[in-house]
Amino acid sequence: MTTLELHNGSLREPIPKELLGSAVLDRTGDFEAGSYQSFTLTYTAGRFGIDDSGSIRVVFRFATDQTNPQFDDPTAPGFTEVVASNNAVLQVRFDPKGNIRPWDRTLQIKVVKGFMKEGDTITVRFGVTDHGGAGMRLQTFCEGRYEFRVLVDPIATYNFQTLPEQPAISIIPGM
């Protein structure tokens, strides 16, 4: 193997999908288009945990009019809280163009102090209503399978891999 092949800036072999961890939603099923809802997504770290400066992303399709996650006003729609089970310090940001299309609407969660070991969790509460907020407004059009797609970069190489099973809901017409 040449030096160029060894250090070409790409991960030669991805981590096997079954070792990446898992993500689940607290609620699944049918939800009315345009309604305000709250969801808790829990990511459980896989075999390699998440290194200091590793990240997860929760991404959504670009064609949506849902409320963006926000972290500043707990009384406003879309208020989102993120916490690590082991008290690792997390940096959280929303970037509407933070991933490749069509999954470019990105909530990025980076471990900035500490690390996650296998079995540790990151809990994301979308549409928190505890402080008077309305929740997260779902998109106003129907979608049979609406994913909260989770990607993970466990070893901090900026090589985000898609989890093998994705949390999803169904967005249906109003009643």
PLM feature segments, named:
Residues 1-175:
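Ser/Thr/Pro/Gly-rich, low-complexity intrinsically disordered stalk/linker tracts of secreted
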